[in-house]
């Protein structure tokens, strides 16, 4: 296997290779300390260094890893997106994955993006990459953990998992362009018949478990709201433990709070409340949650805001309730059990 000689860097790693059709050559994206270095080759044997990207761009709390250069459609125009993981330096501590929207000419990647953008604001989605040979789709999967505690989580016979595969797309909000992510449509293969409830009025606290005929994990729970208001979705068990997922209108942030979620004392930063900005300017709100026995993946506003979290309750969560001081109305609530273990 031909390899590129390391020029003397400690971090010279994670090659991702793609075919660049306009110039009939292969492009390799390589993590090189705090940058991504691009190499090209006509035959996968002889490689030429083309350029570096990273100085003064994005987050640099730690070394860059797992680069992935992809193209996505933007209303008929092709745009380039560079996905880069780093550890530490994430938006909610520890490891995380950022992205840059820009252009690539076969030699140099450029981006006018000034703010750091994250593919997932939760603490537990890292080192993700996309598949090849998926047609016009770009499908992404990440490692569902964080290097802050990956080797400390209280599990037996297994340690950590992967996120759901996600379809990546681009979406404009005002003058900004963002990368969205939503569960792949193939998830329908393990979905049961949906339980749909309309016009759910929520005052102080409303039990959703009774409205769905009981709760079984894993499941998919979707909420569509006509107004953007504060809410808290609480998963709880008979041990008094709870995981809280919600939206804070004043801060314009989604959040997941696992402070009292169960086993949390194995690492000092695990018990925490994590936040993600609401990027949408729509006056309506939609939220889709994939909830398993020890993880939740949140996709809000058609995937503009995403969060992934793991948790370790001492007893299974069996109840779901919705709380709000704003008298919200859930226009449509859909609960779907997933048969992943069958």
Report the location of each language-model feature.
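Hydrophobic beta-strand segments that make up the repeating blades of beta-propeller
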Residues: 26-30, 80-83
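Short glycine/acidic-enriched loop and turn motifs that connect beta-strands
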Residues: 34-35, 87-90, 147-148
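Conserved Ser/Thr-centered positions that define the repeating blades of beta-propeller domains
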Residues: 38-44
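Acidic, glycine-rich loop-and-beta core segments that form the ion-binding/anion-interacting portion
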Residues: 72-74, 80-81, 87-108
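Beta-rich accessory regions
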Residues: 75, 103-342
């Amino acid at each position: 296997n031909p390899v590129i000689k390391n020029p003397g860097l400690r971090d010279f790693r994670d090659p991702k290779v793609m075919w660049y059709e306009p110039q009939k050559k292969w492009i390799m994206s390589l993590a090189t300390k705090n940058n991504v270095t691009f190499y090209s080759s006509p035959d996968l044997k002889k490689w030429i260094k083309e350029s570096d990207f990273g100085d003064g761009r994005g987050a640099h709390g730690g070394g860059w890893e797992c680069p992935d250069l992809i193209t996505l459609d933007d209303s008929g125009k092709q745009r380039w997106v560079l996905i880069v993981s780093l550890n530490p330096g994430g938006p909610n501590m520890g490891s995380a994955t950022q992205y840059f929207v820009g252009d690539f000419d076969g030699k140099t990647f450029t981006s006018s993006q000034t703010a750091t953008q994250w593919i997932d604001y939760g603490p537990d989605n890292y080192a993700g990459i996309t598949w090849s040979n998926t047609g016009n789709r770009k499908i992404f999967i990440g490692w569902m953990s964080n290097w802050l505690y990956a080797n400390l989580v209280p599990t037996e016979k297994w340690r950590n998992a992967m996120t759901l595969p996600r379809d990546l797309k681009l979406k404009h909000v005002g003058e900004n362009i963002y990368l969205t992510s939503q569960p792949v449509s193939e998830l329908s293969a393990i979905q049961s018949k949906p339980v749909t409830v309309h016009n759910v009025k929520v005052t102080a606290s409303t039990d959703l478990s009774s409205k769905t005929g009981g709760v079984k994990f894993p499941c998919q729970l979707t909420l569509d709201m006509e107004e953007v208001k504060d809410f808290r979705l609480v998963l709880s068990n008979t041990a008094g433990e709870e995981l809280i997922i919600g939206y804070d209108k004043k801060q314009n942030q989604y959040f997941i709070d696992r402070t009292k979620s169960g086993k949390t004392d194995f690492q000092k930063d695990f018990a925490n409340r994590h936040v993600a900005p609401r990027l949408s300017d729509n006056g309506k709100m939609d939220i889709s949650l994939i909830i398993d026995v020890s993880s939740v993946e949140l996709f809000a506003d058609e995937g503009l805001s995403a969060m992934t979290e793991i948790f370790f309750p001492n007893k299974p969560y069996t109840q779901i309730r919705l709380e709000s001081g704003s008298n919200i109305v859930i226009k449509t609530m859909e609960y779907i059990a997933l048969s992943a273990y069958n």
